[in-house]
Structures are given as C-alpha cells and as structure tokens.
C-alpha cells in the first residue's frame, strides 16, 4: 500500500515553495486499489498537511491508468485561470512553474499537486446555494469560453457519451429479456430514445471548452465573506457548455443533501433556482431552452440510479426474473420519456 511520511511531505513543501515544517497530516481520501489487485501500483490519495505556523495545504498523490501529467497540469492551470478571473478557488502552488510533477515515494511513482486547504465546505444545498452555484458555473463557463481554454479529459456529464446520470446502455443490454416481457413496449422505448437523442444531438458539434466537471456540495465551499468557491478539478475536461449546465443542474437537484423542509421533493425548487442563477449570468438561447425538455426526459427515463443502483432497479428486477416489476419499469420509462417540461426559469 502506498504510504507517505512527514519527511516526504517536507520535501514536497520545499519543492513547492512552502518553507515551513510539517506539523502533521491526515488522510482526506484514499482509493484502495490494492484490495482488487495486491500488486497494483495505482494510487489516489489526498491528504491535509498542517504547517508549524497553523496553516494547511491539500496534497494530492495520483497514479491512475487514465491520468497523465499533462492532464493534471492542464486541470491545475484551469483552476489558476479561474482564480485570475475572479472565481473563488484555493491557491494552487507550483514548483519552478510546474503545477504538477512526478515523485518516487515508497516504491510508487506518483503525480503530486499542492493547494491551500479551505474550510467552509458546503454540506447541503438550499435554494439560495443552488442559485449561487448556477451563477458560479455560468461565470466559470464564460471564463473558459472567453479564454478558449481546453483540457483533454473525459467528463462525467456528456449526454452523448457514457455518463454518471443516465444510461440507455443499461437498459438495452437486457434486450432479449425485455422483449420477452413486452416486445412492443421495448421497441417503443427504443424509438422514443432515438427521438430524444436526435433532439439533444443538435449541440453535438458545438465548440467544447474546459469545465470543472463536478459541481456539487462536496466540491463547494463558502469563504469568510460568504462567496461560494469550488475545488477539486479531478473531473475537469472539455464539454459542450450547455450539456454541462443542464446535467450539473439536474445532478444538483437530485443527488445532494438538502434541508428537511425541501428534502422530500428537492428538484421542484433546486432545479429552477440553479438554472435561473445560471441564466442570469449566461442567458440560455431560445434553441437551448427549446431542447431542454428532451434532454431532461432522456436523463429521467434512463436515470442510472433506477437502471442499476437502486434496490428496486430495473437490473435487480431482471436479475430476479420479476417480469411484473420489469413491465412496470418499462411503462415508467415510457411515461418519463413522454414528460417534456419547459426549462424552469
């Protein structure tokens, strides 16, 4: 298992221009790749390192199959660009101009980055926070577009690719079983999916720009002046900005922690708050507003949590050969595809 010592951290401090001693450190996040493969040399470790003066920095250690030094460097440069343009982000340190560099530590080769530790992490999302986050995302998009900034990396929220919100593939992989339950309904769903996808494809060839890629409560903080900021550019990459805006909005409206008074139906208030905030900073075009219902229906119909992860998911119903439950899911998917709400601005 990858391990670090205070001496390792002090060496990093020196390289990155932090001329203090390390008073201690704690792990914030660790991926245990060795559990699946004892010989794995893949690493993702994030630590909080405290200095003898009482300040703290976050050090990220990475060695993953899909991560390159160029990618991490570009992600760091994007965070710096945002900060230079008024977006609240933690200070990113550099070692002689390098925001990311390779280290050999305890027998592992890892990419290292260093940034200030920030407090005030947001634990839940209310309508005010959602509106402010929408504004923040729009301003970030404006900076990225204005500066023609790019990061070559896959993102979580692109509707025309594998993504973390919905998956038609998780439906279609069960084609034969679904057809055995109700062939006509299966074909209706496939045709409906094609119709929605064709509408959403309108923006497929739009220019793509760098996005942070994972606006959420666990990656947001509020500074001492009440300004919302963003950290963690691990999922930063190029995306069509409209796709990023809508999918981030739905993500924020469905998958966060919310105050008790809205927790039972957060989307009804969080989604319009987020999109309205975004629209005030970066107005949606008529065409973007027109396409929204189809993208929303696509996300809802094949919502990944319902397709795969929920205890009562379609996948579980199929695994249990519960034909009645599967038929109910097929009917529900049809209903969701038919629900085409206007963009709630």
For each predicted feature, which ranges?
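A cross-family kinase active-site recognition segment
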Residues: 127-183, 208
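ATP-binding pocket architecture of kinase catalytic cores
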Residues: 52-151
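ATP/Mg2+ or Mg2+-diphosphate-binding catalytic cores
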Residues: 302-345
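A glycine-centered beta->alpha junction motif in the catalytic cores
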Residues: 108-124, 171-173, 300-316
